[in-house]
Regions:
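Active-site neighborhoods and metal-handling regions in enzymes and metal-associated proteins
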Residues: 1-219
């Protein structure tokens, strides 16, 4: 249902990365991203967060007319609708070599997605995913400050949201996101989409955009 959207978003992320040079503005870079989606999808809808540098501490929004600099992070949280269905994924990028601290945070967030996937299973509840994801934060003295994902489908954000105390059952056959981010000295967020089956959650985006930090360095 969302394979076409995910492939197009993956290609658009890669086009932005490949076009990056210091001195280009955030607007110029986003134009590359959007033109790739236009070419691949034609008629589609999109909502997004596109935030650079200090703006990543705001969690959401759009950074306009900004010239990226070494040490910045970029959060691109992208929801795309095609043929009646929405995907909702997020990747974070680094301008120049990531610092040791940025690497540590990226790996923590990546692992929290892996833990959340274990809880996304038949018979589970929405709160189970938040608990699993947030456990990785607690181990590092942190807290996940927003939901840990939600259902997607004919809307980009549907109920249930994965929040503490949400007892809504998970439903086999539905599409869900797992979403995790930390926003302190810099912001980093990652989000993948999953199909829930009787045998567990199938990650629909990992093969397209593996979570290897070196793949997200802008040089």
């Amino acid at each position: 249902m969302i394979k076409k959207q995910l492939q197009a978003v993956s290609n658009a992320y890669k086009a932005l990365k490949n076009s990056f040079v210091l001195g280009k503005t955030s607007d110029e870079l986003f134009e590359v991203f959007q033109k790739t989606l236009d070419k691949e999808l034609g008629d589609y809808e999109m909502v997004y967060d596109y935030i650079w540098g200090i703006d990543t501490l705001n969690i959401d929004g759009v950074t306009k007319n900004y010239i990226p600099k070494e040490g910045d992070t970029l959060i691109m949280d992208i929801s795309v609708k095609k043929d009646g269905f929405w995907c909702d994924v997020c990747r974070s990028f680094f301008v120049g070599a990531p610092t040791d601290e940025q690497r540590k945070v990226f790996e923590m967030i990546k692992q929290s997605l892996r833990e959340g996937q274990k809880a996304l299973k038949a018979g589970g509840k929405a709160c189970d995913i938040y608990k699993k994801v947030n456990t990785m934060y607690e181990l590092n003295g942190k807290t996940l400050v927003h939901h840990a994902g939600h259902k997607i489908g004919w809307e980009p954000l549907m109920q249930p949201q994965f929040l503490q105390g949400n007892q809504t059952p998970l439903v086999v056959g539905e599409l869900y996101t797992i979403e995790s981010g930390l926003y302190e000295k810099f912001g980093i967020r990652l989000e993948n989409n999953f199909l829930l089956t009787e045998d567990g959650a199938i990650d629909l985006f990992e093969d397209l955009m593996p979570l290897k930090i070196e793949e997200y360095v802008l040089r």
